[in-house]
Amino acid sequence: FIHDSLYPSEKEDISKAASFIHHFDQLLYQVNTLNESNVIIFTNNVEESVKHLRAFKLSIIERHLTSEMKIHLTPTFINHMVNELEEYLLILSYLKQGKTPPIFHELHHHLIWLVDASGHAGAINDRLDGVEKRLKEKSSTFTKHFEQFYLKAVELAGYLRTNIHKFPALK
């Protein structure tokens, strides 16, 4: 998303984004060669790469907020990308120790992915031609539903502070 959304004048960031694409493609290629003897080293390398990508995206948000760069993505959309990277770093923190990540409460995932889904539904709506009235209505409805589900998840996650992890509203 970032590479194709940067203004052509953002040459340095375009180059960095292309470098990240190439680097992560290389990591993906290495997945087929993983075994018990190299998986931890690989995971540590991935973690380091993800941290660099996170820093790059945060620098874009910072410069976007201060009007020092031009990109066709909102700071909020990029922030959602950072949230995804942080979730991946959480998973990697277990994998690099040879541990299986725990199963987090479903609301943990709702708080990450519902806001992301809403952003994607909104982006789809924004890219649809105005003559696609039915599709735009459906997309707008999806956006609203995801936003409503997210707000509900925020409140339900607050209920978890009672140490009750299952209650009727979660069904």
Q: Which residues does each PLM region occupy?
A:
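Surface-exposed peri-terminal alpha-helical interaction modules
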Residues: F1-K171
